[in-house]
Regions:
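Phosphoinositide-dependent membrane-docking surfaces
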Residues: 1-43
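Terminal and domain-flanking low-complexity segments
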Residues: 39-113
């Protein structure tokens, strides 16, 4: 279960079937796989770090958690499209936008990478 009002940042890494969806939320909400955002995580994903720093300037007290979705092969693109259409207040990194374009068929799957 993902509550859209808690989704702060959406990012993707890797490509094609190996795409990983990284979701940063403002609450854990019954999710055992959600872990607190750490410096190591931010160092690994610099695009997420830029958005995260912007959010922390707005609300320094807020604790953020992240979850990485690795399973699901190409179904992750459908999931990403659903997140994009329902979580309108979330920040999306440029990599996530490119993956959403693939999900919507605006970019041919073979053109990327």
């Amino acid at each position: 279960i993902i509550l859209c009002e808690n989704v702060a940042i959406v990012h993707t890494s890797k490509e094609r079937e190996d795409v990983e969806i990284i979701i940063v939320t403002s609450s854990k909400f019954r999710n055992k796989k959600a872990r607190p955002v750490t410096k190591g995580f931010l160092k690994k994903y610099p695009e997420v770090e830029r958005e995260y720093n912007r959010l922390k300037k707005i609300n320094e007290e807020q604790t953020y958690y992240f979850q990485i979705i690795r399973n699901g092969s190409l179904r992750k693109y459908i999931f990403l499209e659903n997140i994009y259409t329902t979580c309108v207040k979330s920040a999306y990194t440029p990599a996530a936008i490119e993956s959403i374009k693939i999900a919507r068929g605006q970019i041919n799957f073979n053109e990327r990478g």
